[in-house]
Amino acid sequence: MSKNSVIIVAAGKGKRMNSSISKQFLQIKNKPILYYTLSKFSTHESIDEIVLVTLEDKIEVCSDIIDKYNINKVSKIVPGGKERQDSVYNGLKGVSKDCEVVLIHDAARPFVTSDIIENGIRYTNQYGAAACGVIPKDTIKIKNEKGFAIDTPNREDLFIVQTPQCFNYNIILSCHEKLKKHNKKVTDDTMVLENYGKSVYLYEGSYSNIKITTPEDLILGEQILEKLT
């Protein structure tokens, strides 16, 4: 039977947090951010396995969190790579052979909802690839190299991409392998498919599905958690 797998990318160092502790290990309400993220997927009935990607020297820390909070479905903890795309590729190589849909999610994005996860799987089965996100609330400007505004795109045409980003496993693995061969650099996994002419369906995420990257995000995260509990 085919599986739905999730790769949790926890290999970042979180330089913008101005902390010696990686952002995924910082705490909200006395629990590490990674705990909340793992719990969302481990308790979701449509997720069959979790592959956690982290820094090699943080594998034991992750293992301790998994054991302490009795988190199920984590099949492997694998070391990350030099760049995020390398870490994702390592995760892709670590999922089960019978994986059909793979979700790729930021460890520092702990407020993903069950509906976002379920819709990602559903749209991937329908279209082959899907990513959640939101329309920007603010007006976006395009500026030139001298710093002057030159255009104002329609907000309805813009989309702030979040995670999970969800894919047919064979499609995303094939595109990542081509990316390595051609030595291309990307900032997220939708770009991996775009590089090879593949379409990604964009569906509604949540403004609460934030990625915690700055000290201000930690404060906002506490407020979001209070509303959710």
UniProtKB/Swiss-Prot annotation:
InterPro entries, per database record: IspD (IPR001228), IspD/TarI (IPR034683), IspD/TarI_cytidylyltransf_bact (IPR050088), ISPD_synthase_CS (IPR018294), Nucleotide-diphossugar_trans (IPR029044)
One annotated GO molecular function: 2-C-methyl-D-erythritol 4-phosphate cytidylyltransferase activity
Site (Transition state stabilizer): R16, K23
Pathway in which this enzyme or protein is active: Isoprenoid biosynthesis; isopentenyl diphosphate biosynthesis via DXP pathway; isopentenyl diphosphate from 1-deoxy-D-xylulose 5-phosphate: step 2/6
Site (Positions MEP for the nucleophilic attack): R155, K211
Gene Ontology cellular component list: cytosol
The family this protein is said to belong to: Belongs to the IspD/TarI cytidylyltransferase family. IspD subfamily.
Identification of the protein by name: 2-C-methyl-D-erythritol 4-phosphate cytidylyltransferase
Species for this entry: Clostridium botulinum (strain Hall / ATCC 3502 / NCTC 13319 / Type A)
Gene: ispD
